[in-house]
Amino acid sequence: MAPVKVVLLDIEGTVCPISFVKDVLFPYALEALPGTLKAKWDSPGFASYRAAFPAEHAGSQETLAAHVRDLMSKDLKISYLKSLQGYLWETGYRNGELKAPLFADVAPQLARWREHNGAKVMIYSSGSVPAQKLLFGHTNGEPSDILPWLSDFFDTVNAGPKQEKASYEKIAAKHQEYPIGEWLFLSDNVKEVEAAKQAGMQSYIVDRPGNAELSEEARKEHRVVKSFEEIGDL
């Protein structure tokens, strides 16, 4: 197996619990939505978020809010929704109401890979790049802000859907100094891991508390780790 030069990380269920997104971030966004729409509806800074929504849902605060609630109830990963969620979370992160609860092994292992192995660490999540940066800039660890440790960020807008091989090829093509076989993608999602492997990356399934149960087939087909510590040095 080729040495790993780039570690590409999923977020939800990989570096932090799925429950943080489902039980903390999503409810926070829904609670903040009406007041934000009322305060920012006509402000220039909000215009791009509003304009990204389909016209039939962007005509009034009520129709936009109803559409957001509908999309979130179905957990649909649509880019304009993800962008708005990041906007809503920004206040919570900045005022200290929101802090990302990274699993205890994450920050020490990222530091180890960077400092001892010389690897680059990058992020690929269905959450928007601005939302990713908010999360890693406001963690429960010490230091709280680990953005300086991360070299690049990818989402469904700048890379594509996470279950498609072409998305991983596109990500690797942006950093051609690292052959695709020297990338390691870590995710809790079996289909994402399969897509990354099809593209030529190394990839492991991360099995964290609260994640979906893995099938026996998935466990036989892929390497499964419960902690980044199990990966050790690259």
UniProtKB/Swiss-Prot annotation:
Give cofactor(s), names only: Mg(2+)
Question: Gene3D superfamilies from the xrefs?
Answer: 1.10.720.60, HAD superfamily/HAD-like (3.40.50.1000)
What does the note accompanying the cofactor annotation read? Binds 1 Mg(2+) ion per subunit.
What does the entry list as the binding residues for Mg(2+)?
Answer: 10, 12, 188
**One record GO biological process:** L-methionine salvage from methylthioadenosine
Instruction: Provide the transmembrane region boundaries.
Output: none
Q: Cite the binding residues for substrate.
A: 125-126, 162
Compartments in which it is found: Cytoplasm; Nucleus
Record's PANTHER family? ENOLASE-PHOSPHATASE E1 (PTHR20371:SF1)
**Name of the protein in question:** Enolase-phosphatase E1
The organism's lineage is: Eukaryota, Fungi, Dikarya, Ascomycota, Pezizomycotina
What gene name is given for the protein in this entry?
A: UTR4
